[in-house]
Design a protein with these regions (language model features):
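ATP-binding glycine-rich loop module of kinase domains
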Residues: 72-115
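Short acidic-glycine loop/turn motifs at beta-strand connectors
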Residues: 57, 85-87, 218-221
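Catalytic activation segment of kinase domains across protein kinase-like and atypical kinase folds
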Residues: 189-256
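Rossmann-like AdoMet/SAM-dependent catalytic core
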Residues: 2-80
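Short, surface-exposed beta-strand-loop junctions and turns on beta-sheet-rich folds
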Residues: 98-99, 143-144, 230-232
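Conserved structural core of kinase catalytic domains
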Residues: 124-192
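Extracellular structured ligand-interaction cores
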Residues: 46-50, 134, 205-207, 212
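Short, exposed beta-strand/loop patches in secreted or surface proteins that constitute
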Residues: 78-84, 124-130, 215
Length: 259
């Protein structure tokens, strides 16, 4: 994070952060983080700081950086929000290991393939272009579906939150209802030889991380902002819906009211 990109309320809700030393864990960390953010105290409680000193100011400044390096090396990457002079911001994803280059560069072709499928349900993808180091994506503004749901829950409008969530669940269901699911060797390699009961629906290409935090709403524009975990083989649509509901409800204790 930086002064130009501090965390949003509700963003700090995970406990498995790679801290540099042992720390005490609170019973309800998310409300504590939200309280710190409301009172502009986040810098006072930050874990560590990075200070860059040099004679020349870089043309492209990094205002936020996230390392996803707890994964296997072939998926390890860094996500930056960058600012180029007075121009608008953009997002850059670069591999942190040579073996992850294929995974990162694959995003550009995935964005084109998924855009055609999602357009049927009024969903867009943030545009992705190849760069020398990795890929460059649009920096989009708006509020995530997760933020909209949280606002309703905090106001006690649980029925409205449920209707909003399931409006998007049905979009996902329709996207993944064009084909009958069957296990491919690629599916078994990733998910194992799981048992199958009954007939399941799917599509030929599947983004399993289509969760509320990755759906951005800006007036009439609805965008999917992270499609890194997309596979070019059939995956049951019900599994994607399960992840969508599970990762929203289980990521923050305040959402238990919807269970």
């Amino acid at each position: 994070y930086s002064d130009e990109r501090l965390p949003f309320k509700g963003e700090l809700n995970r406990l498995e952060t790679n801290y540099d030393r042992l720390r005490l864990q609170l019973f309800q960390e998310s409300p504590v983080y939200d309280s710190l953010l409301d009172n502009d105290l986040f810098p006072e409680f930050s874990n560590s700081f990075l200070l860059l000193i040099g004679r020349e100011k870089p043309e492209i400044a990094t205002v936020y950086s996230k390392f996803s390096n707890e994964r296997s090396p072939e998926f390890s990457l860094r996500t930056d929000i960058c600012k180029e002079g007075k121009k608008d911001r953009f997002v850059r994803k670069v591999p942190t290991e040579a073996t992850a280059e294929k995974h990162v560069r694959n995003l550009e072709s995935l964005s084109r393939e998924m855009a055609r499928i999602y357009a049927k349900e009024g969903l867009e993808l943030n545009q992705c272009t190849l760069e020398k180091q990795g890929v460059r994506l649009e920096f989009l503004r708006g509020k995530t579906l997760e933020e909209h749901l949280d606002a309703l829950v905090e106001q006690g409008r649980n029925e409205e939150a449920e209707k909003l969530l399931f409006r998007y669940v049905e979009k996902v269901r329709r996207i993944h209802s064009g084909e009958a699911f069957y296990k491919t060797p690629e599916f078994v390699k990733v998910f194992g030889n799981v048992s199958q009961e009954g007939t399941l629906s799917c599509s030929g290409i599947s983004n399993i991380d289509l969760v509320p935090a990755n759906i951005l709403i800006d007036n009439d524009r609805i965008s999917v902002i992270d499609y890194e975990w997309t596979f070019r083989f059939p995956i049951p649509g019900n599994f994607i819906i399960y992840r969508m509901i599970h990762y929203y409800l289980e990521s923050d204790g305040k959402r238990r009211a919807l269970k």
